[in-house]
Amino acid sequence: MGPFDCAAETLPACRAVLQRLTEDDLSRPTPCTEYTVGDVGQHVVRSMVLLASVAGERIDTPVAGTLEENVAATAEAALAAWRRHGLDGPVAVGRSVMPAGLAAQIIPLELLVHGWDIAQATGQSIDASPEVASYLLARARELITQDKRGRSFAAEVPVRPEATALRRLIAFTGRPP
């Protein structure tokens, strides 16, 4: 499994949540307490633009269209950039250097976790297969290091041992599932 396999599941799942949003939903609070649904969606768009640049390609931030259209367009463009770049070798992500294959995993991780945030805020659910959620949890454990806790991510939330892979992933990212 890799970022493209995961995104083949997480992008449609995220889009399904975004397609059901109303204009009023955009101002709803999310589990990311300082961000609204609209803020989280725009964060995903900006993340996809950044991740495309990490793969060496510039994509524009959309200025028109629905949140669903903008997330989908930038995610698809970022995935295409990574397909062209490939998953071998190191890449610079901000001040860090990491394996390209790991950096590309941020795309499906962002789509699933922030899709979950938006789903929770709007009374929806988001689906992910146990395989994809488990795989992304393993990648999240590589990406979310202790030094990122408290700034970008809250502390891991405890969950029962029998919790689903998606619940474990969400809890690991500091959100109460």
PLM feature spans:
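Structured surface interface patches that mediate subunit assembly and partner/cofactor docking
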Residues: M1-D5, E9-A16, R20-T33, V37, ...
